[in-house]
Amino acid sequence: MTDRADADRPATSPTGLRLYDTMTGAVRDFVPLRDGHVSIYLCGATVQGLPHIGHVRSGVAFDVLRRWLTAKGLDVAFIRNVTDIDDKILNKAADAGRPWWEWAATYERAFSAAYDALGVLPPSAEPRATGHITQMVELIERLIDRGHAYTGDGDVYFNVATLPDYGKLSGHRIDDVHQGEGVATGKRDQRDFTLWKGAKPGEPSWPTPWGRGRPGWHTECVAMCEAYLGAEFDIHAGGMDLVFPHHENEIAQAEAAGDGFARFWLHNGWVTMGGEKMSKSLGNVLSIPAVLQRVRAAELRYYLGSAHYRSMLEFSETALQDAVKAYAGVEDFLHRVRTRVGTVVPGDWTPKFAAALDDDLSVPIALAEVHAARAVGNRALDSGDHETAMTQARSIRAMMGILGCDPLDERWESRDETSAALAAIDVLVRWALDSRADARNRKDWATADQIRDRLKEAGIEVTDTADGPQWSLLDGDSKDV
């Protein structure tokens, strides 16, 4: 999927890979900073609630990038952070009457379970924001010393006016910038953004030279990027909704601190429903457990990865079932070859498959090559040409392995994904229902009802019975608690 005419020329980089860089608006040759090594930072989850399929699309998309780079013989350092301190986390935990750290840890586990269910490789490191307060404070001190940040009413702000090219990633003109942070009395200019939030009653806080408080979101990622990958690294990735203000503000801090930061900026498109971004605030989310009640994890992974990573993925039941059928066709062919001919070990991917992935991870074209090989293999198998059938099957295994959904991989064959997903969600639902029971014992009916309602929003129905509460996925099987 290319956006510029010159992007059609063959790759000339040592890796053979060309990627669309949001900063330049063009597909560029990817040349790592260090020969043979690639450093990637992916903005991970803000662990405020159960993951939905929109949340995990970035994990699937950039898992393919990581697998492809690794297959090319490159050593990949892949960092995916966890935002475990945030306004939404604090507010939701307070509403539920739970400690904020317990709330964050619970949903961090839920995200980890979702990534694992979808076959996303674990990151090289998965730093939590709260584990890097020291690095954040040091970064803010550098910005203050360089004249790019100032204190006000216990907070610390970044002075946007000190960077004339602010907005270069998103295309925002500096005079038109609006941070969406609301009115803050300590700000000199409403275009400025928060680096550090002064302590408030009942909120967690850490000591700093300018008083107790907690970090701003944008500061967290800069500190963690540089702690693990250094002042300059290869790729910074995330959802397209992060381009502004989050990634724009990361760039501002890093450059103001004198660091090179990311050389490529990659952004994946949203999962949409009815043309709208899948979002809890819009009420149009599909939780991972709810979807895995209808399809297998490998099928959901195939679906999420079937569109080009930069395009919008409009969710529909028809499209999901089309993906299920397409995956089944590949799976059935491999099983037929294994039954009739023998063990199928991964072989070589085709040149067209490699060319597709080298062209900004054009997975739809790569999948077309998979299905072309399947068609050739099926004809060969039906005609008794077992050698050709096996060659095609081995190639398919190699290609589907890069895409993370090889049907003969032991992770997909060795377990019942639906049962595993239900077991994982059962742990989380039990925790929520224990909280609800505590609230009912305190006669805090409002909190008890709120927990039940939030579970329902996530696709989980709770029914009170004489034997205790039962939960079920909406339109699914029930489970005693």
Curated annotation (Swiss-Prot):
Pfam families: CysS_C (PF23493), tRNA-synt_1e (PF01406). A motif ('HIGH' region) lies at residues 45-55. It comes from the Bacteria. Its cofactor is Zn(2+). It catalyses: tRNA(Cys) + L-cysteine + ATP = L-cysteinyl-tRNA(Cys) + AMP + diphosphate. Its main location: cytoplasm. GO terms for cellular component: cytosol. GO terms for molecular function: ATP binding; cysteine-tRNA ligase activity; zinc ion binding. Gene3D superfamilies: Cysteine-tRNA ligase, C-terminal anti-codon recognition domain, HUPs. Keywords: Aminoacyl-tRNA synthetase, ATP-binding, Cytoplasm, Ligase, Metal-binding, Nucleotide-binding, Protein biosynthesis, Zinc. The keyword RNA-binding does not apply. One of its GO terms (biological process) is cysteinyl-tRNA aminoacylation. Zn(2+) binds at residues 43, 221, 246, 250. Its EC number is 6.1.1.16. A motif ('KMSKS' region) lies at residues 277-281. ATP binds at residue 280. HAMAP family: Cys_tRNA_synth. NCBIfam families: cysS. Belongs to the class-I aminoacyl-tRNA synthetase family. Monomer. This is Cysteine--tRNA ligase. The gene is cysS.
